[in-house]
Structure formats: C-alpha cells, structure tokens
C-alpha cells in the first residue's frame, strides 16, 4: 500500500461532509470534510504503487475544470481507474455543495 499526500490551493468553499463509494466495492471510497482554509489537503492510501504522478495529474485537471474546494479529502483506492476516481471525487464535492 502506498501513502500519498497532496495539497492544492482552494478556489471555492463548501460546507459539511460527504462520502462516495464503498471500500468493499472493489474500487475506492472518498471522504470529504469542508474546512475554513485556503487549501485542499488530500491523503490517499492506494494499492497501486508509484501512482503519485497519476493522482497529481487527476487533481490538476479537476482544478482546471471546476477549481478545488477547501478542506480535507481522504481516499482509499483499490485500483480504481482514473475515470472512476474522478467520478467519486466529483460526487463528494457535489454532495457537500448541497449539504
């Protein structure tokens, strides 16, 4: 298992908490907690070794498209494809936006 920590400047604020996916589903779960800060801190535990560049590229793309919210994001990944990872991350941000 690889542990990855990333930090990004936040360009928007959300409130509350959100969860998307289930660890037992075989792909990934994402937990988001809003914070009054200027950054999004991301902690990833993944079964895929040497994947930091992939995660960095995914978050860079998300940041360009919609901006990233302030808070804490915890990801438990068990080999999800980049498409599934993006969907799960966007789901927690959408849920928190409507909390």
UniProtKB/Swiss-Prot annotation:
Covalently binds the prosthetic group of malonate decarboxylase. The modification O-(phosphoribosyl dephospho-coenzyme A)serine is found at residue 25. It is found in: Cytoplasm. The keyword Phosphoprotein applies. Coiled coil: none annotated. Pfam families: ACP. InterPro entries: Mal_deCO2ase/Cit_lyase_ACP, Malonate_deCO2ase_dsu. Its main location: cytoplasm. The keyword Kinase does not apply. It comes from the Bacteria. Keywords: Cytoplasm, Phosphoprotein. GO terms for molecular function: acyl carrier activity. GO terms for cellular component: cytoplasm. Subunit of malonate decarboxylase, it is an acyl carrier protein to which acetyl and malonyl thioester residues are bound via a 2'-(5''-phosphoribosyl)-3'-dephospho-CoA prosthetic group and turn over during the catalytic mechanism. This is Malonate decarboxylase acyl carrier protein. It comes from Klebsiella pneumoniae.
């Amino acid at each position: 298992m690889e542990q990855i920590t990333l930090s990004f400047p936040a360009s928007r604020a959300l409130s509350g908490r959100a969860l998307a996916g289930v660890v037992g589903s075989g792909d990934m779960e994402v937990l988001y907690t809003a914070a009054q800060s200027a950054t999004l801190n991301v902690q990833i535990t993944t079964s895929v070794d040497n994947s930091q560049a992939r995660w960095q590229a995914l978050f860079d793309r998300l940041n360009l498209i919609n901006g990233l919210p302030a808070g804490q994001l915890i990801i438990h990944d068990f080999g999800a494809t980049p498409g599934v990872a993006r969907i799960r991350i966007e789901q927690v941000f959408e849920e928190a936006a409507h909390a």
